[in-house]
Amino acid sequence: MHCWCLQGAAFLPSILVIWSSAGFLFSYIISVLIGHVPPFVPYISDTGTSPPESGVFGFMISVSAMLGAATMYTRYMILERQNLSIDFLPIYFNKISLAIGLFGCIGMGIVATFQEMAVPAVHDAGALITFICGVMYILLQSYISYKSCPTWNTRATCHIRMTVSLIAFIAVVPMSVFSILSGRKRLDWKPSDEGYPYHLTSAICEWTVAFGFNMYFLTFIRDFQGVSIQISTEIHEDF
């Protein structure tokens, strides 16, 4: 009997969620044990700023970005095929959703490459791209899910996706605003520090959005189970 999370192409969102979650948790555990960040809700990027955890963070987030892009492209192809049998979606809508999602993956690559304290402006720009494009992507995918219901999705799945999307959307605003209000960047936050309440609120929202993405991709597993991925290789005779 095959594992339900490995049937068809379901391994893609499954590995994405497992790998991304492990990347966050591994860098958090290492940074806390070494004493680089306080254990109570640091920023995700703070846990991957100092070596050796910075290497773990950068590598795992880079792989997550590639897995995310592969998952989004496969999702795009699935929707394209589904739309052939029942015309429930304009073609451009699926393309726009994919473009936004891939742009978010590029943002993840920027976050992984440019560390928070080394190049803060570039790192912050990458993080902003990741979170904003990520939220836009899952909101669009939730809308698409409702359009394809009940043929390709259950009503319950649509509701779950939209709920996760709205929570992420609500959280991304205070995450950005309170990050600015918290003041200068630092790793050793203490409750007595000026701006700490803003920092704490922003960090909680950041973790909420990040794991909201993971929860959302979990809902793709059922859709991917009935799909197979094939690589076709052709050798041109005139080469």
Curated annotation (Swiss-Prot):
Gene Ontology cellular component terms for the protein in this record: lysosomal membrane; lysosome
Compartments where located: Lysosome membrane
Top-level division of the source organism's lineage: Eukaryota
Transmembrane segments: 15-35, 54-74, 91-111, 119-139, 162-182, 201-221
Key words of the record: Apoptosis, Autophagy, Lysosome, Membrane, Transmembrane, Transmembrane helix
Short name of one Pfam family: Frag1
GO biological process: apoptotic process; autophagy; regulation of autophagy
Membrane topology term: Multi-pass membrane protein
InterPro entries: DRAM/TMEM150_Autophagy_Mod (IPR050911), Frag1/DRAM/Sfk1 (IPR019402)
Summary of the function given for this chain in its UniProt record: Lysosomal modulator of autophagy that plays a central role in p53/TP53-mediated apoptosis.
Family designation: Belongs to the DRAM/TMEM150 family.
Name recorded for this polypeptide: DNA damage-regulated autophagy modulator protein 1
Biological source species: Xenopus laevis (African clawed frog)
Originating gene: dram1
